[in-house]
Amino acid sequence: MSSTTPSDKDRVVIFDTTLRDGEQCPGATMTFEEKLNIAAMLDGMGVDVIEAGFPIASDGDFEAVNEIAKRTQNAVVCGLSRAGAKDIDRCAEAIRPAKRGRIHTFLSTSPVHMKYKLQMEPQAVFELVVSSVTRARNHTDDVEWSSEDGTRTEFDFLCRCVEAAIKAGATTINIPDTVGYAVPEEYYDLFKRVRETVPNSDKAVFSVHCHNDLGMAVANSMAGIRAGARQIECTINGIGERAGNAALEEVVMAMRVRNDKLPFWNKIDTTQLTHASKVVSAATSFPVQYNKAIVGRNAFAHESGIHQDGMLKNAQTYEIMLPETVGVKQTSLVMGKHSGRHAFIHKLEEMGHKLAGNQVEDAFVRFKALADRKKHIYDEDIEALIDEGMVSAHDRIKLLSLSVIAGTRGPQRATMKLDVDGVTKIEESEGNGPVDAVFNCIKSLVPHEAKLELYQVHAVTEGTDAQAEVSVRLSQDGRSMTARAADPDTLVASAKAYLGALNKLVMKRQRDVAQGAAAAAAS
């Protein structure tokens, strides 16, 4: 159980929902392997509860939750469930292998949701709250109940549902700001009043879950904690539906840096925050904005002359936390073609990467190839290199070579060689620009109906020899996959990113077909 006790009344449970709410962000779909990798990382950095997915949503979600439940050593593994019996039973089956499992069941309670979404009367909703929590409690003694759209729910009805949920066996009560509508003072008052009004409120841990539609997710989360909540639901980088969720790195560091005003503690190893941000960014192919608090590239950068002067005299003049506390290495060490395997492995360990022997060897080979083309290799280059290796290990379609003829006189022409399931294929195509020519080559070599939804380029580091990092999102048949790739040649990076997204679509389709066949055979 992850509930608080009188001896640790100021401890805040960190409930990470990157793999569930975070993945619901359009285009943020992760592969099975990426989910396992992120879950292991979250467990290792001290997250208390990992919401691993929504088991009833798909066979893929069920499989991921089930496997994470088997592998997780320390954290509670949680699955999300609607209030129906089928949902709850499926969720219970998914988390069954966990050392500590939790069922998180939810039901809308606001007038607008009950009328238009559920099309149910309040009394029927109330009865379903009781029956759903009771059913979940029959499977596990760790049950969380959420009042969806809690901040727009009528107060008396909310209190009635909360009291009934606790009486039915809920050990955690979550009152989410589902649509990001609340302001801090309002959210504080809501938690304070609910806890004072509900007679059995001391029998459960209260939880906050805030969305960022008005940019107040972190502020609202802190307000809820000050009012007595002791669990924060959040995501790495703040990813999530619409404008996202409260960012884990921000709520954790707010408690650490301003402990004088927020006298609470948590178990997160903050030195892993920057690495975690990069891992999730790579898996979702969502770049972290440069000025993102805590983990953005500019979070500890100072360009103003006045600021730089102050920093040189005393870092405390313009920095409220040490970069090292969030895992930012303050070093000017760069690597190049003369760097050996030992130095490379040391650098990987310093950056928080734990790779198997064959993965290290593969990464080192690609590092040396990059070093032959680029004078200085920075940490950002190595991060991009590792990211590419992690997602390309099982690719069915691989880029072997690419040459492009471009200039002021068109048309532009690309010649590409691919390995498709072990078969080498070559094609030459023209296009309205070099990128179009490259993508037309891929379409000729691997015919598909996927639609290009996103094409984005930015430089990994500074300088004319900087690697270009390209993000590509493809969608087909209701599936949407995003991939990133980096290379000193923008066109090569573009081809790799497109192929990365295409490989993800192929793998997703294969997994769905296999699961469908297995389900049909079992029925």
UniProtKB/Swiss-Prot annotation:
Alphabetical keyword list: Amino-acid biosynthesis, Branched-chain amino acid biosynthesis, Cytoplasm, Leucine biosynthesis, Manganese, Metal-binding, Transferase
Keyword Manganese set for record: yes
Broadest EC class assigned to this enzyme: transferase
Domain of life: Bacteria
InterPro entries associated with the record: 2-IPM_HCS-like (IPR050073), 2-isopropylmalate_synth_dimer (IPR013709), AIPM/Hcit_synth_CS (IPR002034), Aldolase_TIM (IPR013785), LeuA/HCS_post-cat (IPR054691), LeuA_allosteric_dom_sf (IPR036230), LeuA_bact_synth (IPR005671), PYR_CT (IPR000891)
Regulatory domain: region residues: 398-523
Binding residue positions for Mn(2+): 21, 209, 211, 245
EC number: 2.3.3.13
Subcellular location: Cytoplasm
Role, per record: Catalyzes the condensation of the acetyl group of acetyl-CoA with 3-methyl-2-oxobutanoate (2-ketoisovalerate) to form 3-carboxy-3-hydroxy-4-methylpentanoate (2-isopropylmalate).
Protein's recorded name: 2-isopropylmalate synthase
